[in-house]
């Protein structure tokens, strides 16, 4: 498999530290607000990577963290009067619900920073002991001047605009130096004094705790949004070099921005489009399809028109799924599977891979039109659809349930009552009443289909 390494700035062959195994760490959200589409893009992109590696036969260990102690969370506490736990638990639950809607696989481990304080403190202590951290009146700082390879990850330089992203403090030895531990009597005990961890000290310690390897690298792949490359990932890598005398990750992968009106989408810019808002207009899988249809490294401008176009492509997959309802899957068509995996093995070339999916859907429908009772064809189509679900994470729903999107629970209850009434009418051979109920449902924009599995319905 070929992946784009952000450090080498080119595609390279993925050769894991341990043959047949892949360790991946993805920077998760800071939980002070609902997830926006930028968070979703990152989660879905690297969920796709994980799925592809699994399909290729790798054993994957996947960790995604929660930053649940941070300046932004403290500001939210101040603004709302709520506790740290109230805020973080609310937004972790919100994020989890969004990820479930997007059919993102659960990480193997999803640590919170507050659960890893001992590991974080020990990591900072190691940096202090090695003489690469120093104390100021407001906290413990990392001395970037002690790391000869600082900037080697991002390829940046002493650009003033970039350095401005690092928290300022006139007493720092160098403007690039960053805080490891912030003194604050309200928080946690440590050998340095009461306080809380700095953002950059959290992820590197969690990687050490959950994914560490002997040898030259801690993990195979460190992933996240391209906006994290500097300073966050640069600072993580610097700490690992100085504390462990090794590289944090063998490969670094970054997804691109989602823009709104050609500006990067972010909470700080106030132009966030939340996942929960997008999910009001389309099913979660349609949003997922939209996000993976563009290459993970591409920056693209959010468009509702493109979102609906993505849903129409997904609709075709589900309409095909309905045509093989109740069919047991046979064997996936080898050439189709090979074409998809070949494209995805080229740095997740989803455009090419999804073109193969579109071609399969068309040819499958053509085949069923010619021979609708061909059991072998139906079994192969069902197997191909299962493969699509495993790899792309779409097509997992019941075919009819997918087309019930937008129907309220009250409406579903009314529809069920009418269908039950129709079933009873048919049992009593009162076919005129059954037809009347069908017409009544059609007037409600509900289409019904009698199948071996029972009467199914969908929103027209």
From Swiss-Prot:
One term of GO molecular function: zinc ion binding
InterPro entries tied to this protein: Cys-tRNA-ligase, Cys-tRNA-synt_Ia_DALR, Cys-tRNA/MSH_ligase, CysS_C, Rossmann-like_a/b/a_fold, tRNA-synt_1_cat_dom, tRNAsynth_Ia_anticodon-bd
Cofactor(s) demanded: Zn(2+)
EC number assigned by the record: 6.1.1.16
A Pfam family reported for this protein in Swiss-Prot or TrEMBL: CysS_C
Catalytic activity: tRNA(Cys) + L-cysteine + ATP = L-cysteinyl-tRNA(Cys) + AMP + diphosphate
Protein name (database record): Cysteine--tRNA ligase
Single biological process term from Gene Ontology: cysteinyl-tRNA aminoacylation
Span of the annotated motif 'HIGH' region: 29-39
Organism: Campylobacter curvus (strain 525.92)
Assigned protein family: Belongs to the class-I aminoacyl-tRNA synthetase family.
Cellular component terms (Gene Ontology): cytosol
Cofactor note: Binds 1 zinc ion per subunit.
HAMAP family listed in its UniProt record: Cys_tRNA_synth
Complex formation: Monomer.
Gene field: cysS
NCBIfam families from the UniProt entry: cysS
UniProt keyword annotations, A-Z: Aminoacyl-tRNA synthetase, ATP-binding, Cytoplasm, Ligase, Metal-binding, Nucleotide-binding, Protein biosynthesis, Zinc
Entry-linked Gene3D superfamilies: Cysteine-tRNA ligase, C-terminal anti-codon recognition domain (1.20.120.1910), HUPs (3.40.50.620)
């Amino acid at each position: 498999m070929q992946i784009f390494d952000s450090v080498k700035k080119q595609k390279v062959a993925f050769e894991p530290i341990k043959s047949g195994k892949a360790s991946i760490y993805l920077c998760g959200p800071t939980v002070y607000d609902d997830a926006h589409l930028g968070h979703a893009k990152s989660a879905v992109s690297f969920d796709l990577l994980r799925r592809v590696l699994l399909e290729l036969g790798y054993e994957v260990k996947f960790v995604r963290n929660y930053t649940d102690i941070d300046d932004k969370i403290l500001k939210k506490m101040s603004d709302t009067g709520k506790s740290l736990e109230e805020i973080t638990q609310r937004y972790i639950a919100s994020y989890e619900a969004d990820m479930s809607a997007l059919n993102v696989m659960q990480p193997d481990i999803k640590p919170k920073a507050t659960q890893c304080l001992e590991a974080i403190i020990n990591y900072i202590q190691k940096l202090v002991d090695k003489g690469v951290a120093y104390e100021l009146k407001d906290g413990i700082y990392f001395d970037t001047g002690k790391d000869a390879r600082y900037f080697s990850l991002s390829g940046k330089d002493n650009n003033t605009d970039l350095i401005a992203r690092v928290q300022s403090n006139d007493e720092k030895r160098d403007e690039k130096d960053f805080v490891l531990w912030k003194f604050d009597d309200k928080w946690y005990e440590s050998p340095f004094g009461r306080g809380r961890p700095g953002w950059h000290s959290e992820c590197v310690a969690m990687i050490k705790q959950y994914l560490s390897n002997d040898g030259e690298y801690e993990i195979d792949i460190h992933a996240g949004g391209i906006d994290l490359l500097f300073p966050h990932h640069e600072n993580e890598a610097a700490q690992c070099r100085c504390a462990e005398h090794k590289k944090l990750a063998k490969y670094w992968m970054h997804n691109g921005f989602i823009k709104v009106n050609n500006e990067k989408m972010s909470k700080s810019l106030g132009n966030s489009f939340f996942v929960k808002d997008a999910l009001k207009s389309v099913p979660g899988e349609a949003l997922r399809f939209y996000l993976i249809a563009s290459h993970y490294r591409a920056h693209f401008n959010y468009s509702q028109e493109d979102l609906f176009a993505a849903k129409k492509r997904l609709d075709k997959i589900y309409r095909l799924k309905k045509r093989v309802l109740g069919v047991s899957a046979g064997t996936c068509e080898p050439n189709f599977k090979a074409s998809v995996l070949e494209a995805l093995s080229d740095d997740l070339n989803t455009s090419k891979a999804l073109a193969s999916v579109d071609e399969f859907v068309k040819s499958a429908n053509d085949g069923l039109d010619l021979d609708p009772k061909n059991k072998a064809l139906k079994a192969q189509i069902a197997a191909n659809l299962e493969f699509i679900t495993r790899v792309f994470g779409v097509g997992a729903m019941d075919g009819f349930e997918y087309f019930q999107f937008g129907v309220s629970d009250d409406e579903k209850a009314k529809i069920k009552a009418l269908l039950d009434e129709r079933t009873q009418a048919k049992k009593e051979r009162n076919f005129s009443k059954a037809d009347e109920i069908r017409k009544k449902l059609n007037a409600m924009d509900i289409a019904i289909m009698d199948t071996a599995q029972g009467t199914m319905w969908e929103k027209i």
